[in-house]
Amino acid sequence: MRLVVCLVFLASFALVCQGHSSGYTRPLPKPSRPIFIRPIGCDVCYGIPSSTARLCCFRYGDCCHRG
């Protein structure tokens, strides 16, 4: 009896791993960079304080060069 229970468990686990039991079971890919809502100041690179430009550069990877 234990052998039957073990085999049923292994078979159901194999089906779940292959995606037959509940459809799509693969993990979703993670984004390469964290997704943040960017402040408007990062896109407008003139007329913003240098602290805002520095924050955008370090936090979002967008370096605003002030001219």
UniProtKB/Swiss-Prot annotation:
UniProt-annotated location(s): Cytoplasmic granule
Molecular function as annotated in GO: chitin binding
Keywords for this protein: Amidation, Antibiotic, Antimicrobial, Chitin-binding, Disulfide bond, Fungicide, Signal
Signal peptide stretch: 1-19
Keyword ATP-binding attributed: no
Classification via Pfam families: Penaeidin (PF05927)
BP GO terms, sorted: defense response to bacterium; defense response to fungus; killing of cells of another organism
Record bears the keyword Cell wall biogenesis/degradation: no
Residue numbers bearing the Arginine amide modification: 66
GO cellular component entries: cytoplasm
Chief location: cytoplasm
Domain of life: Eukaryota
Disulphides: 42-56, 45-63, 57-64
Protein family: Belongs to the penaeidin family.
Function statement: Antibacterial and antifungal activity. Presents chitin-binding activity.
Protein name stated in the entry: Penaeidin-4a
Naturally occurring in which organism (per UniProt): Penaeus vannamei
